Amino acid sequence: MSNIGFIGVGLMGSAMAHRLIDKGHTLTVLGNRARDQIDALVGRGATEAPNASALAQSSEIVMLCVGTSDQVESRMRGDDGVLAGLNADTVVIDFGTSLPGSTKALAAEVAQAGGHFLDAPLGRTPAHAVDGLLNIMCAGDEGAYNKVLPVLKDVGENIFHLGDSGSGHTVKLINNFFGMTVANAMCEAFAMACLLYTSPSPRDS
């Protein structure tokens, strides 16, 4: 079992964190103003860290599940950031949908500090996370990927290593683009149908 630091316990992050506790891992979580999930995890044995640096010092794997690249960067950098407390050979995993350019920059900074950085954006929902059924699009150093793969399997069903740093986030953005394109096309088709289809509906007869 692994000592894991987890940053970002919103809907998806909290589901993943509870799953990791279920699988026997030791968790340290970063506190925030929204106490419900933090208190629930601490009640199940997790430790609350005062800042990201302290969290990193107690972890062999650091996981982030936050909304934007700016949020990832703010928790990685600075005197209280993950990089300030990073241990040698620690693997940092970004589960968010971040910008590939930011990911590559952070990967270089983590490597310089003696660790490894993986981008691993997610597919599916918090309900899937609770049951360990997420899709995970991972990229970065293959040795680091193989090291944390058993832990990824605790939260994921379909896990892919997609190549160099940034490739996971690139594929996730392409996947999102595809999904939004299909949704927009469907909306246009329905709008056209409403304009052109003049026959009475079955409910009108």
Mark where each language-model region is.
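Cationic-aromatic interfacial patches
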Residues: 189
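A general structural signal for well-ordered alpha-helical segments in protein cores
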Residues: 38, 59, 69, 79, ...
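Rossmann-fold dinucleotide-binding core
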Residues: 4, 97-177
